[in-house]
Amino acid sequence: MRKNLTEIVFILDRSGSMSGLEADTIGGFNSMIEKQKKENGEALISTVLFDNVSEVIHDRVPVQKVEPMTDNDYSVRGCTALLDAIGGAIHHIGNVHKYARNEDVPEHTLFVITTDGMENASRRYDSEKVKKMIERQKEKYGSVSYTHLR
């Protein structure tokens, strides 16, 4: 494991029910990025925006290179495919870690999920499958954390 390297995956709900919360979501993301830039060590940032589809806007970008999010980046629309977004992000990051040299796997991985609502549109993943994926990642890498913000 690579000491002093943290992988942070933001999964941000942009479904229609987030209408009126755009400024809070953007401000919260930007605040967390600015705080992370001041921390010791390195951080890689991935950001997934989701409604009924997921869009990756950062894929393992060094935190120092992440620009502030704007309302051009984040606008609400669609339904809430929460489980598809979480499952897809875990699958992607899990594969990156699986095929990386051990010395390149981050010491810590944190998934930060911001949503206001309940699942209503996922087609690829269900709650049981996502729970199993989370447990498998925790068993394999140990230092994987999930934070759900509402």
Where are these regions (language model features)?
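Exposed acidic/Ser/Thr-rich ligand/metal-binding surfaces
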Residues: 6, 86-136
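Conserved small/polar residues in nucleotide/adenosyl-binding loops
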Residues: 147-150
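Short glycine-/polar-rich loops that comprise or flank the Walker A/P-loop
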Residues: 5-6, 141-143
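Short, charged loop segments at secondary-structure junctions
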Residues: 53-88
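Arginine/glycine-rich "motif VI" loop of SF2 helicases in the C-terminal RecA-like domain
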Residues: 37-38, 135-141
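Von Willebrand factor
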Residues: 2-59
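Phosphate/oxyanion-binding active-site loops and adjacent basic polyanion-contact surfaces
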Residues: 21-25, 78-87, 122, 126
